[in-house]
């Protein structure tokens, strides 16, 4: 899901339009997963799906409008586009694993002794690469399952009752951010 949102068509934009508009008027919008350990329990951790964006104050309305568009209207059922995205992720992942082999090895070895590192490996390391490689190899057989999985993940992850906004900027804009972020909770 983190690798798909922002890279598929939405209700009002094709992927290309979304990409061009977002990058022309903001510093970008990225989805990801953050992992936080619990200080009093080295085996426990918490994960959060994140959507991050940067914009000048004059483009703040647009930034939140585009975040809302991505979160609420992304077309996750376009299997042709999903196949392209999976291929791109596999290619970039392969280059990343090779180019940063030392980091890959550290994460993979840590995954054997730490539940948090194991999760991180599954989300961004060798485990993730193997998952993506399997999806690409068996895409035709799994495409309906992939779409259903993405749609279920959206329903489970993007929820009003577990929504948090983190803002860095001028104090004068806090109220504007509170108002704009309300639309993301739909």
Regions found by a protein language model. Name each.
Residues 1-73, 79-140, 160-169:
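M16 family metallopeptidases and their MPP-like homologs
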Residues 2, 19, 68, 151, ...:
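Generic solvent-exposed, charged/amphipathic alpha-helical segments
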């Amino acid at each position: 899901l983190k690798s798909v949102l922002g890279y598929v068509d939405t209700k009002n934009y094709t992927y290309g339009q979304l990409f061009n508009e977002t990058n022309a008027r903001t510093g970008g919008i990225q989805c990801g997963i953050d992992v936080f350990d619990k200080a009093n329990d080295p085996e426990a951790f918490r994960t959060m799906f994140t959507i991050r964006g940067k914009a000048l104050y004059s483009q703040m309305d647009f930034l939140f409008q585009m975040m809302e568009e991505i979160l609420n209207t992304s077309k996750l059922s376009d299997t042709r586009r999903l196949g392209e995205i999976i291929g791109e992720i596999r290619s970039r992942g392969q280059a990343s694993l090779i180019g940063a082999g030392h980091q890959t090895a550290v994460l993979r070895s840590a995954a054997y002794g730490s539940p948090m590192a194991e999760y991180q490996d599954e989300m961004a390391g060798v485990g993730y690469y193997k998952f993506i490689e399997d999806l690409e190899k068996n895409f035709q057989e799994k495409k309906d399952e992939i779409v259903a999985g993405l749609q279920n993940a959206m329903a489970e992850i993007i929820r009003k009752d577990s929504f948090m906004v983190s803002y860095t900027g001028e104090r004068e804009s806090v109220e504007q951010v509170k108002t704009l972020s309300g639309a993301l909770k739909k």
